[in-house]
Amino acid sequence: MDYLPLFADLKQRPVLIVGGGEVAARKIELLHRAGAQVWVVAQTLSSELEQQYQDGRIHWLAQDFLPEQLDNVFLVIAATNDTVLNAAVFAAADQRCILANVVDDQPLCSFIFPSIVDRSPLVVAISSSGQAPVLARILREKLEALLPTRLSDMAAIAGRWRGRVKQHMASMGERRRFWEHAFSGRFASLISRGQLTEAENELQLSLEGQHRALGEVALVGAGPGDAGLLTLRGLQVMQQADVVLYDHLVSPEVLDLVRRDAERICVGKRAGAHSVTQEATNQLLVTLAQQGKRVVRLKGGDPFIFGRGGEELQVVAQAGIPFQVVPGVTAAAGATAYAGIPLTHRDHAQSVTFITGHCRPDGDDLDWQTLARGRQTLAIYMGTVKAAAISQQLIAHGRSSTTPVAVIGRGTRVDQQVLIGTLAQLESLAQQAPTPALLVIGEVVNLHHQIAWFGQQPQTESAISPSVVNLA
């Protein structure tokens, strides 16, 4: 270990900064967050530091550095581009046994700044001992993505409750088990949803021995396929799951991000071939949550856009099970973006309509007259089976048979395939497309040939036969 990690209490302690430029300003901002009393030695200040001085946030010594300025200073930072001055600052500090840091000059540092993940009062520091600062920054970014922002609330509440927990539980082992349960159970879940009062009530119930073994359900949108489109919140919830119920539309890459020891249950549905009935899925969500498990219902795209997520949550809510919803990138947004097809465009479409090709058996017919109007984009989910009927109805109600269309198969995935043609060719295109597929109808499809960016560049469209663009 080249450096001993320490956390210093700088509240109201004097810290000297030598230098008044941008580098000094960055260090000063960090010191402000720690509550330090900042003194700056510099002949001139940057405009940012000048404003801080006018606001009374820093003290300014408009003079050259002198060793006696280190008297009664807790630590010093040299942030100048003068190597001779920096060395003099370090030597004077070292002689007085004062911690010193010379920015970007590790040999002249008795302490170094780590990369920081700030969830105060919880703080994570990462250091490469000055050997690979970029690597430390990359690790910090990964931790930022994994650690929920609400950890600060969790740590603050835990701090307020430490005394009460200690009064109720004399044994250190008992207290440890209490907090382990709290930080991985319903208390943590309530914090993540911003329900802080309810979270403290949960702690009180646990202390009084009235805790109920009740789990929760998280309805999570997995996005259209590319694991990079999974939301940060979705990843965090998946990493906390005890059991995951997922559909066929969820890509293997997204499933790989589920907590390793979580149970995985496929309740996938395909048009006309449901492996698990919807009623059975609804009941399974309730049963698992009533067993005290954290259940993630993982759905492709966004769970509230043609995903029957609302129906499932109605059952969960009626059973009194706590739940939360994590939105996802819906297929119409993700697949079209990866295909270079904007859903709206000032010159081509002022509106977009999302349609499902599978309605309830007793559902009313679509308003084809409205859907056939020009200057709009239609994005049709699960429409390949009914592509012929869709094409016929739109043409019959006035939409031109030469209207550009795209069928995007396995959108956003490495084997994405985009088929371009006209409304008259929609049935043929749909028959060729791999599933799952999205139908896009409207003049915006023509922009595909200009702004497609994912995978191979599009082939030239044929006016006679559909063009197939394999973006693998």
UniProtKB/Swiss-Prot annotation:
| Alphabetic keyword roster | Cobalamin biosynthesis, Lyase, Methyltransferase, Multifunctional enzyme, NAD, Oxidoreductase, Phosphoprotein, Porphyrin biosynthesis, S-adenosyl-L-methionine, Transferase
**This protein's pathway:** Cofactor biosynthesis; adenosylcobalamin biosynthesis; precorrin-2 from uroporphyrinogen III: step 1/1; Cofactor biosynthesis; adenosylcobalamin biosynthesis; sirohydrochlorin from precorrin-2: step 1/1; Porphyrin-containing compound metabolism; siroheme biosynthesis; precorrin-2 from uroporphyrinogen III: step 1/1; Porphyrin-containing compound metabolism; siroheme biosynthesis; siroheme from sirohydrochlorin: step 1/1
Q: Which residues bind S-adenosyl-L-methionine?
A: 224, 300-302, 305, 330-331, 382, 411
* Reactions catalysed: uroporphyrinogen III + 2 S-adenosyl-L-methionine = precorrin-2 + 2 S-adenosyl-L-homocysteine + H(+); precorrin-2 + NAD(+) = sirohydrochlorin + NADH + 2 H(+); siroheme + 2 H(+) = sirohydrochlorin + Fe(2+)
**Region named Precorrin-2 dehydrogenase /sirohydrochlorin ferrochelatase:** 1-203
Q: Which GO terms describe its molecular function?
A: NAD binding; precorrin-2 dehydrogenase activity; sirohydrochlorin ferrochelatase activity; uroporphyrin-III C-methyltransferase activity
Indicate where the modification Phosphoserine is found in the sequence.
128
Family stated for the protein in its record: In the N-terminal section; belongs to the precorrin-2 dehydrogenase / sirohydrochlorin ferrochelatase family.
Summarizing the function annotation, the protein's role is: Then it catalyzes the NAD-dependent ring dehydrogenation of precorrin-2 to yield sirohydrochlorin. Finally, it catalyzes the ferrochelation of sirohydrochlorin to yield siroheme.
- Name used for this protein in its record: Siroheme synthase 2
Q: Which organism is it from?
A: Yersinia pestis (strain Pestoides F)
Organism placement in taxonomy:
Bacteria, Pseudomonadati, Pseudomonadota, Gammaproteobacteria, Enterobacterales
